[in-house]
């Protein structure tokens, strides 16, 4: 059932190096392409990266910007990042067997919103395939997109490292239903 998939899905930052057939990811993209989109433009593009050199370069570029970002962060955000053990290091960009880079075509109306709907479908499909991921939104999107020669009209929305989780873990607490909804008015 869909609710069970959603409840079991969690973010994973540490992956086993164990490979798996890329067909599993392709099936997930099949699911994602069924997502609704503004004016039915389907503005998403999924790029699967397996090449270790490309993964290394993507990581290098991401960490360069993340390091600077982490130096500048202050206050509550800094405290939260420390509490959650979120650092500038992005090992998962090389550890996961595959990276799935998801782009939106900026020439299409509602491209960003539509692409993120497809990302949601993709994440649930990964869960159904027994795979794990996290939604990493890289700060220097254009510079990262250059590694894979993405056309300028494609905006990198997220990079999803995909693989089997290295360790068990628990899903973080979700807000109660009454905290996130109402009828007719707030």
Where are these regions (language model features)?
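Short, basic/glycine-rich phosphate-binding loops at helix/coil junctions
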Residues: 5, 96-103
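C-terminal helix-cap and adjacent tail motif
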Residues: 4-12, 83-87, 92, 158-186
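Arginine/glycine-rich "motif VI" loop of SF2 helicases in the C-terminal RecA-like domain
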Residues: 38, 127-128, 152-153
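Short, surface-exposed beta-edge/turn micro-motifs
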Residues: 43-44, 96-99, 156-157
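N-terminal amphipathic, basic helical "cap/leader" segment at the start of enzyme domains
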Residues: 1-94
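Small-aliphatic-rich amphipathic alpha-helix that forms the alpha element of a beta-alpha
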Residues: 32, 100, 105-147, 160
């Amino acid at each position: 059932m869909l609710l069970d998939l959603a409840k079991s899905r969690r973010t994973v930052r540490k992956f086993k190096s164990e490979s798996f057939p890329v067909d599993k990811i392709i099936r997930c993209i099949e699911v994602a392409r069924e997502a609704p989109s503004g004016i039915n433009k389907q503005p998403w593009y999924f790029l699967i990266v397996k090449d270790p050199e490309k993964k290394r370069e993507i990581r290098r570029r991401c960490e360069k910007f993340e390091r600077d970002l982490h130096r500048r962060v202050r206050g509550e955000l800094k405290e939260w990042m420390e509490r959650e053990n979120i650092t500038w290091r992005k090992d998962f960009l090389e550890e996961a067997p595959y990276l799935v880079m998801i782009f939106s075509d900026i020439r299409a109306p509602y491209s960003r919103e539509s692409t993120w709907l497809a990302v949601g479908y993709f994440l649930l499909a990964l869960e159904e395939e027994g795979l794990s991921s996290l939604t990493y939104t890289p700060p220097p999107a254009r510079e990262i997109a250059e590694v894979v020669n993405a056309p300028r009209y494609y905006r990198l929305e997220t990079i999803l490292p995909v693989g089997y989780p290295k360790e068990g873990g628990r899903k973080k607490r979700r807000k109660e239903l009454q905290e996130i909804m109402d009828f007719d008015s707030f």
